[in-house]
């Protein structure tokens, strides 16, 4: 029986080799097949949108990086392996029958090509796969320009830090990786083949091994020299624990920066020492050099800066760091768009100039018509269930949990804000046979309508249990039950069918198959004659009628019906990737997309408007900010919409994008004409972003100042409004974003409102994004911030700074909710209703005053699906006085005196336009018709005190009637309470 040589691999039969080859082919197809299918489908999809240039540019850049980096790393590793193998000793004696090295040698020798070529290729492929994801820094390096601003330390244009430095670090990293792996591989091969021999504490090194290892080690040291050089520049954007700002501080400039230069010089000397061993043949010299470099990095690089920090900077930190804090203040304002030409600060008293309760003050309040007439009583984060119950129409239609705010001009030409939503199809709500593949993807394909509700009014007054008031006043654009386009909304809409939107795209298998193939198939509307269908005629969609298209989409969605179903014909198209934000991210992968996508009627088309940001993470001296943390608030915690956990030090709302809700067309517009980052991307992807001049006037009227950007800016304004570096260091004048008083966690979100224009400082109506800011770790107001969304003043931020005695949102909310009248009323109705306080708005009024407005909503029962909220009261607070009434007008009169609410928008009362009553009549929130008086009886007359006791007994009877569930008894109790209140009012 023949014996196999020690360490040799067994030889496979021809059949075995074929099986192995077939298995490898199958594995490869399983690995790369789905990627090839996705690549082809993406090629089709980008072509349909007109952005195929983006797809090919990204693909070719990734492919080029994969090949270049992979080839470079593979070549260097191959050199390390091949040089060691070629220089191996001719004869290496085995140490014995169990010599492991001899077995490794035999293994390599039996498959030399496999190891010599396969190992470098494998490492190169891995390196290339990782490197191709860095296509953005490479493209920015190739096309990036200047900022026109120089850094304060080195005097270099900021374009070097934004575009060049990341690329240099990328190249250096992969050179270091390649050289390190080559050194390790070279050493291992020399060791296996006897070029390196270890015995006890000593060892021998062949001449080729010494030359090669020294060469690779010397290259690594030279790369470290380059790393020290780049480290100097990266100091300007680094953070350190305990330092209150981003960028190089006193220790960095006076200790770390010189240390980097010293270490650089030592590294050069070390490199010379290493390479000297090629001539001197003495390894002690490079060993001493490397030890010196290691010791120096500990002493000079870490020890010396620590000493300077502890004994020089910390005892005098405010003075030592002031110069660098000033740099950070300026850079942060520049990087986040908070410069003096954008932000205006004005002192604001917080209290009107006229005395409280005076007739003059009431007239001043009423004169602020732009604010008073537009006080928002609908909270878009609360009233979605009312939209669903009253405007859903079909079980498969839906609205988002958090609705949007936009503005339109009403019939009188006045600017008015509206709560808006598109009525989308929700795949998750399809039931039973509706979920069949044909119905799901070819019948239920789209939503129907744009719903708007004026934010400053409701239908009727929720004053009595049997009245159906307090619900939104709906304006609808939709296909009605006669097949005609109903256009009663705030603007005319030609096509209300919604094929693209975030809800319809929420399903994992988000696609619809449309197009003429026989009879109309898509569900459209119903009337007495039955169900009416329609056929999609838009330009969107990828043709799916051919055999190849059917096959690839069948593979993508793992669905055989693509191949066998006769509902797919020659004219069929597939609509997929229908989420507006994801579509924008796909065609502009360099953008960070705002979480607040909203629908708008623009030029008679329904579009989704998406805000896009360009960002950097290495702007010198600019404060590093986490987008996810800065944009998190109480509503994000509830709805889940948030920006990614990304650190940035520069942000611009550089792009406004629209996505057509019918045909899916994506259009990118240049919003910031000065942004160097956007200019670079426009060079990389020419023709993809339209110039700002192409934005239509109608679209301009619907562009909002983006909420996520505003959240980031207000977080930074809380600190970087401070001009003096010493004051900044002490934090004594810092502000902070207040907590939401109506949520268990999270900060108060900013609010869109229509109010008087504080940017122009006149009484014209302006659409603004606003927020209150508290004093640092206190509940008193520090500032009121407003960002204009008006076309003429878009992006201008006004900050009203107020004295420290003005109460903040939490204290105001406490004052309203604990007021005797409010708490008594709430105590009566809360047993049978779910109560929710809405957004607490802060509104400048009456030449110096601040009015706080907080609506109260009631939903019947315990929050089941048939329960939906309506406005029952409006709470107000001004300068220590609380108003609480069924209408804005009455609440204003309570706070400021008669006449203050004269210009407020009254509830609509047309009975014909009232929304339908809830089924069964028992899900209407139970609302007492009167407000009980204060419970205290101090300083009351005997008649008044007796009347008060009657009121309190009547309140108790109302509560008992509620518990009993006897509606007749409850009605009698309410009448008794009404009579008691009348007697109390008339008592003297």
Swiss-Prot record:
Its main location: membrane. It comes from Mycobacteroides abscessus (strain ATCC 19977 / DSM 44196 / CCUG 20993 / CIP 104536 / JCM 13569 / NCTC 13031 / TMC 1543 / L948). It is a multi-pass membrane protein. Keywords: Cell membrane, Membrane, Transmembrane, Transmembrane helix. One of its GO terms (cellular component) is extracellular region. Signal peptide: none annotated. NCBIfam families: PRK00068.1, PRK12438.1. Belongs to the UPF0182 family. This is UPF0182 protein MAB_3498c.
């Amino acid at each position: 029986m023949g014996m196999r040589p020690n360490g040799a691999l067994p030889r496979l039969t021809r059949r075995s080799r074929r099986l192995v080859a077939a298995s490898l082919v199958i594995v490869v197809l399983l690995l790369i097949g789905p990627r090839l299918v996705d690549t082809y489908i993406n090629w089709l999809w980008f072509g349909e949108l007109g952005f195929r240039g983006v797809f090919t540019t990204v693909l070719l850049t990734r492919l080029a990086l994969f090949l270049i980096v992979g080839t470079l790393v593979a070549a260097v590793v191959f050199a390390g392996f091949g040089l060691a193998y070629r220089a191996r000793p001719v004869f290496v004696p085995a140490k014995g029958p169990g010599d492991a090295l001899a077995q490794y040698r035999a293994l390599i020798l039996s498959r030399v090509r496999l190891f010599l070529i396969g190992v470098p290729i494998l490492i190169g492929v891995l390196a290339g796969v990782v490197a191709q994801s860095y296509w953005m820094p490479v493209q920015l390096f190739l096309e990036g320009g200047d900022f026109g601003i120089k850094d304060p330390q080195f005097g270099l244009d900021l374009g070097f830090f934004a575009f060049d430095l990341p690329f240099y670090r990328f190249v250096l990293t992969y050179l270091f990786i390649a050289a390190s792996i080559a050194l390790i591989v070279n050493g291992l091969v020399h060791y296996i083949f006897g070029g390196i021999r270890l015995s006890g504490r000593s060892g021998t090194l062949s001449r080729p091994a010494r030359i090669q290892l020294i060469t690779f080690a010397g290259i690594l040291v030279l790369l470290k020299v380059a790393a020290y050089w780049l480290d100097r520049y990266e100091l300007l954007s680094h953070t350190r624990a305990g330092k209150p700002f981003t960028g190089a501080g006193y220790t960095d400039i006076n200790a770390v920066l010189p240390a980097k230069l010293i270490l650089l010089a030592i590294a050069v000397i070390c490199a010379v020492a290493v390479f000297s061993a090629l001539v001197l043949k003495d390894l002690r010299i490079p060993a001493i050099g490397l030890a010196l470099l290691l010791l120096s990095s500990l002493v000079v690089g870490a020890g010396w800066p620590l000493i300077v920090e502890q004994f020089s900077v910390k005892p005098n930190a405010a003075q030592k760091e002031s110069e660098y804090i000033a740099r950070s203040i300026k850079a942060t304002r520049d990087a986040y768009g908070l410069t003096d030409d954008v932000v205006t600060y004005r002192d604001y008293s917080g209290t009107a100039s006229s005395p409280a309760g005076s007739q003059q003050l009431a007239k001043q309040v009423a004169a602020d018509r732009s604010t008073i007439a537009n006080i928002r009583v609908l909270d878009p984060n609360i009233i979605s269930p009312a939209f669903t119950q009253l405007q859903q129409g079909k079980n498969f239609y839906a609205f988002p949990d958090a609705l949007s705010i936009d503005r339109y001009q009403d019939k009188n030409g006045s600017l008015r804000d509206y709560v808006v939503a598109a009525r989308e199809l929700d795949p998750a709500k399809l039931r039973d046979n509706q979920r069949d593949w044909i119905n799901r993807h070819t019948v239920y394909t789209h939503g129907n309508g744009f719903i708007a509700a004026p934010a400053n009014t409701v239908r009727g007054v929720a004053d009595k249990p049997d009245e159906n008031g307090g619900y939104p006043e709906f304006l609808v654009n939709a296909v009605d039950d006669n097949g005609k386009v109903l256009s009663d909304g705030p603007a005319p809409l030609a096509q209300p069918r919604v094929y693209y939107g975030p809800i319809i795209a929420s399903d994992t298998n988000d696609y619809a198959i449309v197009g003429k193939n026989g009879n109309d198939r898509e569900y459209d509307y119903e009337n007495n004659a039955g169900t009416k269908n329609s056929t999609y005629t838009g330009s969107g969609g990828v043709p799916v009628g051919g055999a190849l298209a059917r096959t690839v989409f069948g593979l993508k969605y793992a669905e055989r019906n693509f191949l066998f179903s006769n509902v797919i014909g020659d004219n069929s198209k597939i609509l997929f990737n229908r989420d507006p934000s994801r579509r924008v991210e796909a065609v502009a992968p360099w953008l960070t997309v705002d979480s607040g996508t909203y629908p708008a009627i623009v030029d008679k088309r329904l579009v989704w408007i998406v805000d896009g940001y360009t960002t950097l993470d290495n702007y010198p001296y600019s404060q590093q900010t986490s987008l996810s943390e800065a944009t998190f608030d109480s509503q994000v915690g509830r709805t889940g919409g948030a920006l990614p956990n990304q650190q940035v030090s520069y942000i611009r709302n550089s792009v406004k994008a629209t996505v057509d809700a019918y045909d899916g067309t994506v259009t990118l517009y240049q919003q910031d004409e000065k942004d160097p980052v956007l200019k670079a991307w426009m060079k990389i992807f020419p023709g993809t972003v339209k110039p700002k001049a192409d934005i239509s006037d109608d679209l301009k009227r619907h562009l909002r100042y983006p909420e996520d950007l505003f959240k980031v800016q207000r977080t930074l304004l809380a600190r970087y409004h401070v001009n003096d570096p010493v004051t900044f260091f002490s934090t004594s004048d810092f502000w902070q974003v207040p907590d939401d008083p109506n949520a268990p966690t999270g900060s108060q979100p900013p609010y869109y409102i229509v109010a008087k224009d504080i940017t122009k400082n006149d009484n014209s109506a302006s659409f603004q994004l606003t927020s209150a800011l508290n004093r640092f770790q206190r509940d008193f107001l520090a500032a009121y911030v407003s960002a204009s969304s008006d076309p003429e003043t878009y992006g201008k931020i006004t900050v009203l700074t107020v004295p420290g005695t003005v109460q903040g949102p939490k204290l105001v909310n406490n004052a309203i909710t604990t007021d005797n009248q409010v708490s008594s009323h709430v105590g009566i109705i809360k047993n049978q209703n779910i109560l929710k306080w809405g957004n607490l708005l802060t509104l400048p009024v009456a030449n110096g005053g601040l009015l706080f407005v907080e609506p109260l909503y009631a939903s019947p029962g315990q929050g089941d699906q048939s329960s939906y909220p309506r406005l029952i009261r409006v709470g107000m607070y001004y300068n220590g006085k609380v108003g609480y009434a069924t209408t804005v007008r009455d609440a204003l009169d309570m706070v400021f005196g008669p006449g203050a609410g004269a210009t407020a928008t009254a509830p609509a009362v047309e009975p014909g336009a009232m929304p339908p009553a809830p089924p069964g009549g028992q899900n209407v929130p139970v609302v007492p018709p009167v407000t009980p008086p204060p419970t205290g009886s101090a300083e009351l007359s005997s008649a008044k005190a007796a009347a008060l006791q009657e009121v309190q007994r009547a309140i108790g009877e109302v509560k008992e009637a509620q518990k009993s569930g006897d509606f007749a008894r409850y009605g009698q109790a309410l009448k008794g309470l009404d009579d008691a209140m009348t007697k109390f009012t008339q008592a003297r």
